[in-house]
Amino acid sequence: MTSITILIPTFNRIRALEAVWPSYLVHPDVQRIVVIDDGSTDGTSDRVRELAKTSPIPVDVVTHEKQWGQPESRMSGVKKATTEWVMFGEDDVWLAPDYCSTLLREAKETGASIIAGRIVTARVPGEFDESCLVDPPSPLRNANEVFDLDSMDARFAERVSGPVPAPYIHSIALIRRDVFSKVKFDTWYSGNSWREETDFYLAANAAGAKVYFTGSTVCFHLRGPISAIGGQRVNRLWFEYLAWRNTRYLMNKHWPYLKRAHGLRGTATGWTIRYYLRRQADQIKRIAQSGFRSTYGS
C-alpha cells in the first residue's frame, strides 16, 4: 500500500534537482511527489512539469510567486499531502533505493512518529554521476557519539546498530502526517533558516512524538558546483550572525524541555554564549588553515 508523499522544497537549483530526481522515482511506498518551488527564477516549475510527464509516480508542483523561505515551503507541501506519512527530500539529496521502505518498516517496528537514516556527503567536482556516491565502511557508534548537545549538532554519517531515540535529526526524514496537528515548522526562521529543523524535532519530542535515527539506510548530500547556487546559500559573515541569532532563539524557546529531558544546566543565554565562543574559535582556526569562504545553510 502506498502511504508516503515525498515533499521537495527547492529554490533555483534545477540542475541539482535534475541530478537527484531519478532517486525519488523508485520507491513503491510513495504515492505522490510534491515539489515546492519557492519563488525560483530558473524555470524550475516548468522543468519539473516536464519531468513529471515521464515519472512513474504522480508529481504535483506548488509554486510560490516569491521566496517565502524553507519553513513556509515545508508547510505548503504538508498541506498538499493526504497520505499517512510524508517524507522531506531536498533538491541536492540522493536517496538510496531502500530509503523509504526501510524507514517505513522501522517506524512501524519501533512505533516511531519520525525517523531518518544516515546522510553522507557526496563530493561532486563536475557533472554528477552515481560513482560520486561513496559510503566506505565505518565502525558502529553509540548514540552519545552521534549527538552533541553542547553544540546542538550531530554526526549523521555515523553508523549505529539500529534505530536509536534521537533528540533531533536531519531534514530527510519520514514523518507521520498527524504530527503536524501538534507541531509545525516555525516561520520565525528566515535567511538560511539555520536551526529550523532542530527546532521542529525538539518541539516534536516535547509534544510526545517518538523520534529515531537509524543506521539501516542512507542518503547522500551532493556538495560541489552543482549545488553552488540557489538553495539557502549565504555569505560567511551573514551565516555567523544567523548562527548566533537563530541559536539564541532556539535555546530560549526549548530550554525548559532541554533541562527536563536532557539535563542541560544553567541558562539558555549562558549556553548560547559558550557555544558561540567555541564556534568562533573553531572558525578562526579554519580560516587560518584554509582561508575565508562562503557557506550554505541547511
What are these regions (language model features)?
Residues 236-248, 252, 256-298:
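Non-catalytic, C-terminal membrane-associated alpha-helical segments of glycosyltransferases
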Residues 167-183, 190-217:
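A short, conserved alpha-helix in the catalytic core of glycosyltransferases
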Residues 64-81:
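Glycine-rich, basic loop-to-helix element that forms the pyrophosphate-binding segment
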Residues 23, 37-46, 93:
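A conserved acidic beta->alpha catalytic loop
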Residues 135-165:
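Short, flexible, basic/aromatic active-site loop/helix in glycosyltransferases
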Residues 86:
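Short aromatic/hydrophobic "clamp" motif used to bind/position activated sugar donors
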